[in-house]
Amino acid sequence: MRILPTLAALLLVATSAHAVEPCQTIHGRAIYYSADGQLRLWHIGTHHEFQPDAYGGATPNQWDKIITLLKAGDTSPAAGSNNALHGDFVVCPTKPYRQGAVQPATLQGMSHLRVVPR
């Protein structure tokens, strides 16, 4: 009797494993919109954006580090939204790609970072 629930669980795991895309390194620009509290990472050269996955759990500190870098000593109420962060980011999408939609992702790494005023 355990075989049927085990097979059902294996099928669920197999189908959900294909729904998530592999990690990729992109050159992007991160911007924090303080009015609505959204942090977006734009893949430069495309129309595609990533946002922190609220349920990704594994690496919230990487997204928090972006906010800290964007603030860069600014103490104004709009701190963080006055700058943009350019660099190379390793993003791991947690939902399948949909054209025209922001894709939730976890952030596994960053390099070649540069803060630029907007």
Give the positions of each predicted feature.
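N-terminal secretory signal peptides
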Residues: 19-69
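Sterically constrained small-residue positions within well-ordered secondary structures
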Residues: 10, 19, 32, 78-80
